[in-house]
């Protein structure tokens, strides 16, 4: 008699409307229960029985109920699943396939089957890309996935690379090339500079050589520098299939052990690469640097032919300048080039120290592998004088390009850095005041004031203060119109010196050429391409970090590291512990609260100040040097747990 009763239907509707509901993100725990995070301040408890219907990271709506005198969230509706397309490891049981998602907070296998178009035969230990097609909160009795493609077979030493690239949907092979891409298409006049003593300085094993340099002393102690850059845009037509592919990739993806090129290797490592004794087309820039270090305003961009006279390595050049080895340049003319470039480098470092912002030297770490791709060691690489020679030359070239584009077009792809936003600027001023460093918001939000602040901090040389100030700084970005680069201390900056490796530099090449050729219909780059380049840069950076984390866990699980003591620097303070970097090899480790002090209530982690207090006393802070011992290597989550060695 109650069937289709409108009064009953209305009553149900009213009850549903009155039942409190919330939306949020599911957060799981090690102990089976979870929480629904509504915002940074508010979360609701999800009992273990209800957690069985959701996954960590799911966005859901839930009904709020009182159960055993506690307010709980009962998942009701799936808004957006955490898993859609995902990567995981295959397990085969009783001829049935399961996939274990490769995400730290997901602990359960998901039943799966290959998609009809997927021809791979999967075995235990293989890795695959999958798509979640059934979710319990949608009324399905189990979670279920479809295998889209195989990533890599079990026990392949390249698992860390292929799985990570697949996770981030990044390419793992070089682009395909067509015959037309090998033909030089630009018939514009080129100056013949093949008689000049151009040299390249790079790593021993570098094959994609972008830049060559020639320098000479002219009147009054001034220096004339010609920067010659490889010219791939004379081979790759704008809008061609390869150009579209390069735009999509954005960058050559440099990963531990190898790279995935933006352009086909036949272009990037052969036809366009400025290999020694090979005649190559280039886009060149002639710049005069005055004896006080200033760049002369008269800048000339032009097309040319060059022939590099020697491929030099950073280590050999640095050793020779520092008189540390028996190596010496092949000829007096090459020797003279190195000496003049060294002089220019010191001149510009002095100028930038007083007028801009100088980079602080930092350690870089490089993995070493066996012939079969097994990680064997990590070596420290320091930035030496030859690195600085190239760096200063490229900075000169990029300042010149930005100036040239601004004067002639008013647009391009500019590298920018905004310094501090207004809110963070207030935090910086307040923080510095605690150390009797007096600055104003108005002052440090100008380029001049920001540079002055950085110079003061460089002189102060306090790692803790520097780390806190860096935390407040904006991230680097790209802009279509001229804009300052606060982190470099420059009014404008536009890179064009790596067109083999960066699509933004290819865009700037085409714009510079259009000015040289006096084209009238020059198209301004779109905001869309700028955003895509930024996003691709972010994804590449995350992939490189993820692979490194994986390799560190593989390396440090070896027996010889079990009880070894490591010097480390604290780099972050979180709610549950501290993160530190091992100085010997660059690995990041986590030290949980329990390993710092047995009574949790007596521990205070202040994330804002980056300090850890025990019973109200400051014990640790970011930048502190500590000694740690590895406690646990978690290969599944690629995390390294350590404890402080007291």
Swiss-Prot record:
Keyword match Signal: no
PROSITE patterns attached to this UniProt entry: RIBONUCLEASE_II
Single GO term (MF): exoribonuclease II activity
Subcellular location: Cytoplasm
EC number: 3.1.13.1
NCBIfam families associated with the record: 3_prime_RNase, PRK05054.1, RNase_B
Protein name: Exoribonuclease 2
Provenance organism: Buchnera aphidicola subsp. Schizaphis graminum (strain Sg)
Encoding gene per record: rnb
């Amino acid at each position: 008699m109650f069937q289709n009763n409108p009064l009953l239907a209305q009553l149900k509707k009213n009850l549903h409307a009155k039942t409190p509901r919330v939306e949020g993100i599911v957060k799981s725990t090690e102990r089976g229960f979870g929480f629904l995070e509504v915002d940074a301040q508010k979360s609701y408890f999800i009992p273990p029985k209800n957690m069985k219907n959701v996954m960590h990271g799911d966005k859901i709506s839930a009904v709020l109920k009182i159960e055993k005198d506690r307010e709980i969230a009962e998942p009701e509706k799936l808004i957006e699943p955490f898993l859609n397309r995902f990567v995981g490891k295959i397990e085969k049981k009783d001829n049935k396939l399961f996939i274990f998602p490769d995400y730290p907070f997901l602990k359960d296998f998901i039943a799966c089957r290959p998609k009809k178009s997927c021809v791979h035969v999967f075995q235990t230990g293989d890795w695959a890309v999958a798509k979640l097609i059934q979710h319990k909160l949608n009324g399905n009795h189990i979670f279920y996935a479809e295998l889209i493609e195989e990533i890599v077979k079990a026990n392949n030493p390249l698992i860390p690379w292929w799985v990570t690239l697949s996770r981030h949907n990044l390419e793992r092979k070089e682009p395909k090339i067509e015959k037309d891409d090998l033909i030089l298409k630009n018939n514009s006049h080129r100056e013949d500079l093949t008689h000049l003593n151009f040299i390249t300085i790079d790593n021993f094993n570098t094959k994609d050589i972008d830049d060559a340099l020639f320098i000479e002393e002219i009147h009054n102690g001034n220096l004339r520098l010609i920067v010659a850059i490889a010219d791939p845009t004379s081979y790759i037509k704008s809008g061609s299939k390869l150009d579209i592919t390069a735009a999509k990739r954005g960058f050559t993806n440099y990963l531990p052990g190898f790279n995935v090129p933006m352009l086909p290797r036949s272009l990037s490592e052969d036809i366009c690469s400025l290999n020694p004794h090979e005649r190559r087309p280039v886009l060149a820039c002639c710049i005069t640097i005055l004896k006080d270090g200033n760049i002369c305003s008269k800048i000339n961009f032009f097309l040319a032919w060059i022939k590099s006279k020697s491929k030099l390595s950073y280590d050999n050049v640095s050793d020779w300048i520092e008189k540390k080895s028996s190596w010496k340049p092949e000829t007096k003319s090459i020797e003279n080039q190195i000496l003049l470039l060294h002089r220019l480098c010191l001149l510009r470092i002095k100028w930038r120290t007083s007028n801009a912002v100088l980079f602080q030297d930092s350690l870089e770490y490089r993995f070493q592998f066996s012939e079969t791709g097994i990680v064997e060691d990590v070596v420290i690489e320091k930035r030496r004088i030859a690195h600085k020679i190239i760096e200063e030359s490229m900075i000169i070239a990029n300042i010149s390009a930005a100036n040239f584009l601004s004067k002639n077009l008013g647009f391009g792809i500019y590298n920018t850095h905004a310094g501090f936003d207004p809110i963070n600027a207030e935090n910086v001023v307040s923080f510095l005041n605690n150390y009797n460093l007096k600055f104003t918001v108005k002052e440090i939000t100008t380029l001049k004031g920001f540079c002055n602040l950085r110079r003061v901090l460089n002189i102060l040389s306090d790692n803790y203060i520097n780390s806190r100030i860096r935390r407040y700084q904006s991230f680097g970005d790209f802009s279509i119109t001229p804009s300052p680069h606060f982190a470099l201390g420059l009014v404008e900056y536009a890179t064009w010196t790596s067109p083999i490796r960066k699509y933004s530099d290819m865009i700037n090449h085409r714009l510079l050429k259009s000015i040289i050729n006096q084209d009238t219909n020059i198209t301004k780059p779109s905001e869309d391409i700028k955003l895509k380049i930024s996003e691709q840069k972010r994804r590449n950076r995350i992939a490189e970090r993820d692979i490194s984390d994986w390799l560190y866990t593989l390396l440090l699980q070896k027996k010889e590291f079990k009880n070894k003591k490591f010097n480390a620097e604290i780099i972050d303070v979180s709610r549950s512990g501290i993160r530190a970097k091992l100085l010997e090899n660059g690995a990041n480790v986590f030290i949980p609260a329990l390993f710092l002090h047995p009574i949790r209530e007596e521990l205070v982690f202040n994330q804002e100040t980056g300090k850890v207090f025990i019973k109200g006393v400051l014990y640790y802070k970011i930048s502190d040097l500590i000694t740690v011992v590895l406690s646990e290597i978690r290969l599944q989550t690629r995390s390294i747990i350590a404890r402080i060695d007291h």
